[in-house]
């Protein structure tokens, strides 16, 4: 096996939407960095049975609704 071809695999903190922090191994960022999620399994309609609403973090849902408001969806 070739040496030094694989990315660094280290521990990071993943902050869920409810504020809980989970320690995971990843190639993202550096050791000890924190990745904040916009949506996770506890808040995603695919895993909650559609009971939860999607968060409009970037204004995309609002922009879509405004663009197609006259069609009566």
From Swiss-Prot:
One of its GO terms (cellular component) is ribonucleoprotein complex. GO terms for molecular function: rRNA binding; structural constituent of ribosome. It holds the Pfam family Ribosomal_L31. Gene3D superfamilies: Ribosomal protein L31. SUPFAM superfamilies: L28p-like. GO terms for biological process: translation. Keywords: Ribonucleoprotein, Ribosomal protein, RNA-binding, rRNA-binding. HAMAP family: Ribosomal_bL31_1. Binds the 23S rRNA. Part of the 50S ribosomal subunit. Belongs to the bacterial ribosomal protein bL31 family. Type A subfamily. This is Large ribosomal subunit protein bL31. It comes from Ruegeria sp. (strain TM1040) (Silicibacter sp.).
